[in-house]
């Protein structure tokens, strides 16, 4: 529910820690708002558009967008069932000190574009799809299982953000870049210094 035109409040009914939906409330389309909780959007078809802090994201199948507390955002285009949404208190993440200290970094990279050739992208999407499926299951301790999946999701997202940050910083190489550079240096050294055949 929007209050004062911009603030969204949620009601955690029945003591559930997660609000899960496989459709968007169409009354929120093109309405800029913010809220004090985390929201994860999963695109289940192409052609969705979401804006966070005046940056537009065109979301296609399996793309993921994370909206953090205080982010001004709006869903500009979707069909209602083309986006899945999960909402939960940020305290579920910030209770873990390591996670709390990484929140500023995570909020710099809210968009996870799906790459079908990337195994980590597939893992992240599968975690979220199981997360959504578990909500409607009859499993015992399902919120415990959902919380475990949520932490696993954010562990992978956090590692992705660290990698993106390291790639953007000059002079910091990730292990793959470092190994590739060493191999290239070795090949160059061999080609320059060993011009006669080895016997």
Residue ranges of each PLM-predicted region?
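Glycine-centered loop/turn positions within well-structured domains
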Residues: 48, 73, 196
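Conserved metal-binding segment of the jelly-roll/cupin
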Residues: 59-72
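Generic protein-terminus/edge-of-domain signal
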Residues: 1-60, 77, 98-112
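DNA-contacting interfaces and partner/effector-binding or oligomerization modules
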Residues: 101-104, 130-134
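Short, Lys/Arg-enriched, Trp-marked, Pro/Gly-tolerant hinge/linker segments that flank
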Residues: 112-120, 135-146, 155-192, 196-197
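Ligand-binding loop in jelly-roll beta-barrel domains
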Residues: 70-98
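Amphipathic, well-ordered alpha-helical segments in soluble domains
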Residues: 39-42, 123-130, 149, 153-156
